[in-house]
Amino acid sequence: MTATGAQTANPNRTAPGKVGGGDAARAAQLRAANINPRTGLATDYLNHFNEAVMLLEMIPDMPECAEDFLGWQPLSYAEHFTASNFKARDLAISAYNSANPVIRAEFDNITSAMTSILTAVSDAMREARQDKTRATLAEQATGWVKPLVTLAGGIINGGSEADVDYIMTH
């Protein structure tokens, strides 16, 4: 392969095993806590959004689940871990705060989009008077949020831009 044909590494991506310039011991500590050492992010945060999706998926068959969905509250990454039983919650928050700002911004943009969608759907469901309307809102929101959860998971796991592009087009 010629020099012009070789792919260049993205300078905005943190090198494997390095979260904010951490060392091998820090990377091992992060891995043991289920935090990706390359990105400094943990998939546990996605459980917060998966819970909302699960409730939305139940609404068409069980309209009474709308009340459960309406009880879902947005939480930031730090708020989620602070409120969770995640063993390494302080480490998760610290790693997030030390993450590459470009990766964290990508991740935060996606989680912000999910939060906006779920909040808007929640507001619309509060106004809806018919179960059929709530079911339609739930189905639409699920279709919008699920790909974003997948995309966020790709960022957490250090997926490449090509992976992200593939997810967004399929």
Describe the residue ranges of each PLM region:
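Signal-transmission coiled-coils
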Residues: 20-165
